UniProtKB/Swiss-Prot annotation:
The keyword Zinc does not apply. GO terms for molecular function: 1-(5-phosphoribosyl)-5-[(5-phosphoribosylamino)methylideneamino]imidazole-4-carboxamide isomerase activity. GO terms for cellular component: cytoplasm. Belongs to the HisA/HisF family. It comes from the Bacteria. It is found in: Cytoplasm. The active site is at residues 8, 129. GO terms for biological process: L-histidine biosynthetic process. It is an enzyme of class 5 (isomerase). It comes from Bacillus cereus (strain ATCC 14579 / DSM 31 / CCUG 7414 / JCM 2152 / NBRC 15305 / NCIMB 9373 / NCTC 2599 / NRRL B-3711). It catalyses: 1-(5-phospho-beta-D-ribosyl)-5-[(5-phospho-beta-D-ribosylamino)methylideneamino]imidazole-4-carboxamide = 5-[(5-phospho-1-deoxy-D-ribulos-1-ylimino)methylamino]-1-(5-phospho-beta-D-ribosyl)imidazole-4-carboxamide. Keywords: Amino-acid biosynthesis, Cytoplasm, Histidine biosynthesis, Isomerase. The gene is hisA. Pathway: Amino-acid biosynthesis; L-histidine biosynthesis; L-histidine from 5-phospho-alpha-D-ribose 1-diphosphate: step 4/9. This is 1-(5-phosphoribosyl)-5-[(5-phosphoribosylamino)methylideneamino] imidazole-4-carboxamide isomerase.
Amino acid sequence: MEIFPAIDLKEGRCVRLYQGEFSKETVMNEDPVAQAIIFEKLGAEILHIVDLDGAIAGESLNLPVIEKICKAVRIPVQVGGGIRSLVTVEKLLSAGVEKVILGTAALYDKSFLEEAVRLYKEKIIVGIDAKNGFVATRGWLDLSEISYVSLAKQMESLGVQTIVFTDISKDGTLAGPNFEQLAILQKSVGIRLIASGGVASIQDVKKLNDMNIYGVIIGKALYEKTIDLEEVLQVTKLC
């Protein structure tokens, strides 16, 4: 199982939100580059970065910081948030990003998604963020009428190989992932699933591993130290 330590960027800083509420932010590190280096030194093999400003604006606003992170670490970096054009995809890949995560665009701009998948194949990941089972977009501000399962099936049919699934109600809560929705999703599609939101303990990670979930994004639990990164990396290697 892949472990993805998370760095959420807002106004150039590393922050955490509570249930996706931008008004409920906590600054975890004023220097995201330093935080990336810390994760790498602890053994992280890949980083998950979200441009929160970009998710709202619809364009990558933290590109300079992302580029600095890519230059500062030797491990791969995947980035999401505000990626709604091929130009932005190309800028991020040129900056050293390994994979990009499309969210809003996957729902509202299928032609862009299809072209991105055609050009960059496995480098394109789709992020599905759900609230009460329905897909939320534009930085989680808008709630659609499309179920997370329906969108996942559409993405699989378009050639997407990996999905990041987030239950927004769990994000930043340390209340545990939405195992039920993840299980439904896994039965519905045959592509890689990365779980995100609410992961609070090594037991959560072990349960996801037992479900054969491909990867898990861990954010607040690492900063609050309810999960030790070195320990969880060791545990997942032994599973």
